[in-house]
């Protein structure tokens, strides 16, 4: 690669609070996955550290991939390749429906099974769509503020991706993708009235989707009163709430959770936050939420600074990553606490899952790269004067 392809950046200007927040969240995730998965790993696989070791490997790979993205992937190259991102996302979604490639877990076909590797298609879709939409907004920002066509085009493409996600089904990914897209378009300056109209349509369609499948209706009914069927459809949520109740202020101690002993399903994946709350109590609970608030604030701050400097692609790429992190964390935490219906979403950096951890690491690398490139360009401008 030439120097033009790899833009030199000032690595001393890296956003250290963001970097360390992401690292600490990932390390906390490793600890909690290790604790929450001991019994289930020993029972299912005969090795209590199976999931912990795999998660550690994913974390190491994530650090390596994130570092590579930060040091060696110029955002100008990604901006030029933005039109490739949608075909990549579509291919990933179609692959889950190919016999022999798609893997079904708990009734959902969301994974691509490759030799020695399983990839969750929706994680690829989130990243690819953010990369595409950031480039679209950077090129069409003025048109987005005035033209319906410019606003509806990305929504139409989004609808295709959502349809394929619903066929898996993966309603949680649909919600995250929708929030991310609408958030990025809103920040681009699309008039509020258009959002209200689209919002009404989205709510109506969301209602139809929610009531089209019996299992979604059951989830909604369970969400309103999980104790009405605590040994049936409300079992997972009631066990999660029991975990929160047992935690009190300071928890029962790391490794001492009772709910992870086959009472709480998905204790090391979607509901690891409940186990964390049981073992570390309200103190650990608040610390984790504070970590995500700090992460979101730093990322949005970087995006705002980039937009103020006129680096629109950089800014909206960062905004998109921020919406993915914040919406997914908010939904997962809300589901664990019984504030939202069950969605089947992992908690970024914390839950067990290689695809989620790797894509999160890539996004952090892109965010840090965007900030570093902006600092380099600013310093080069001062030197030129």
Swiss-Prot record:
A GO molecular-function descriptor: peptidoglycan glycosyltransferase activity
Enzyme class, broadest EC rank: transferase
Membrane-related topology note: Multi-pass membrane protein
Main localization, broad class: membrane
Subcellular location: Cell inner membrane
InterPro entries linked: Cell_cycle_FtsW-rel_CS, FtsW, FtsW/RodA
The enzyme's E.C. designation: 2.4.99.28
Family statement: Belongs to the SEDS family. FtsW subfamily.
Name used for this protein in its record: Probable peptidoglycan glycosyltransferase FtsW
Organism placement in taxonomy: Bacteria, Pseudomonadati, Pseudomonadota, Gammaproteobacteria, Oceanospirillales
Gene of this entry: ftsW
């Amino acid at each position: 690669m030439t120097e033009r392809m790899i833009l030199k950046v000032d690595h001393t200007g890296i956003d250290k609070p963001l970097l360390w927040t992401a690292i600490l969240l990932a390390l906390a995730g490793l600890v909690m996955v290790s604790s929450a998965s001991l019994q289930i790993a020993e029972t299912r696989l005969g090795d209590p550290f199976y999931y912990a070791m795999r998660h550690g490997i994913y974390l190491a790979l994530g650090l390596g991939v994130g570092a590579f993205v930060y040091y060696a992937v110029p955002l100008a190259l990604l901006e030029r390749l933005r039109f490739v991102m949608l075909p990549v996302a579509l291919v990933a979604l179609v692959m889950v429906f190919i016999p022999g490639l798609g893997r079904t877990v708990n009734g959902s076909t969301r994974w691509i099974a490759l030799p020695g590797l399983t990839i969750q298609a929706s994680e690829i879709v989130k990243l690819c769509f953010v990369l595409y939409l950031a480039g679209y907004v950077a090129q069409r920002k003025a048109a987005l503020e005035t033209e319906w066509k410019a606003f509806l085009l990305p929504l139409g493409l989004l609808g295709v991706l959502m349809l394929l996600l619903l066929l898996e089904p993966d309603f949680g990914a649909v919600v995250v993708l929708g929030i991310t897209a609408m958030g990025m378009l809103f920040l681009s300056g699309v008039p509020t009235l258009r959002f209200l109209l689209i919002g009404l349509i989205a709510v109506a369609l969301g209602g139809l989707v929610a009531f089209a499948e019996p299992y979604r209706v059951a989830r909604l009914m369970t969400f309103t009163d999980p104790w009405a069927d605590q040994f049936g459809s409300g079992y997972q949520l009631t066990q999660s709430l029991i975990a929160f109740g047992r935690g009190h202020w300071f928890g029962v101690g790391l490794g001492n959770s009772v709910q992870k002993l086959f009472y709480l399903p998905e204790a090391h994946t979607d509901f690891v936050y409940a186990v964390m709350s049981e073992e570390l109590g309200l103190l650990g609970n608040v610390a984790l939420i504070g970590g995500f608030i700090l992460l979101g604030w730093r990322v949005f701050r970087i995006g705002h600074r980039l937009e103020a400097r006129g680096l629109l692609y950089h800014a909206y790429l960062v905004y998109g990553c921020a919406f993915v992190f914040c919406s997914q964390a908010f939904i997962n935490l809300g589901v664990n606490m019984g504030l939202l219906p069950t969605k089947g979403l992992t908690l970024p950096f914390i839950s067990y899952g290689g695809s989620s951890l790797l894509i999160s690491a890539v996004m952090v690398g892109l965010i840090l790269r965007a900030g570093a490139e902006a600092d380099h360009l600013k310093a080069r401008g001062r030197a030129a004067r």
